Amino acid sequence: MDNERIKDLGEKELIIRLSKYMPKNQTKDDCASLSIAHENLLINTDLMVEDTHFNDKIIHPKDLGWKSVTTNYSDLISSGCVEFIGINVGLIINPETKWHWIKEFYEGAYEALDYYGGVILGGDCSKGIKNGISITAIGLQGKLSLRRYSSRPEEIIITTGTHGLSRLGYLLKRNKTNKDLSKLSGKLISQSLNSFQRPKPKRDFLQNIIKSRLSTDQIEIGCTDSNDGFYQAV
């Protein structure tokens, strides 16, 4: 086992092995819930690496800044976040990167925070061969506890959007659809590119969940973000 490499394990197996060092169910959701002074904090971290998750050929740095915030925000609201406090930004930057790229990235992040609430709380940076971005988002949990492990067999699954649009947008940007683009409507292409480059989590999601409850005593509901795909989410 000492000779095993991470690339041979895969993400799922790595998480399973690391979960034994964490509290029960800690790896079941995208956010950790911490009780502090009668409030629960929701904390989520996403990491993106150049040429693995992004590059300048498929996404503009301003769109990348927006997306970095909104993907984290989506994780928070799907865990019951009622107030988006803000983000910490960790950057690994190649010394040859132009300032303009960094500026555009932060402008995109600021636009997203201006739209959804929250501020840039701080962060850190270092140099590396390829650019990397780590965003830690923090929010306050409301009365509802939305956790993936609260789901039960035979319950109805409800989604808040159309799955596959972001993936199609990604493939379109990379010219890897293997499809005749003339068969795709202009509306579908536009929706797919917007979903990939400028995803917009639904801010009224939590309020709609509250309205749909059969009982006001029900505080735990099975829920998760599906940024990684519907199959992965369930």
Please give the residue ranges for each predicted region:
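Helix-biased detector of long, well-ordered alpha-helical tracts
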Residues: 1-234
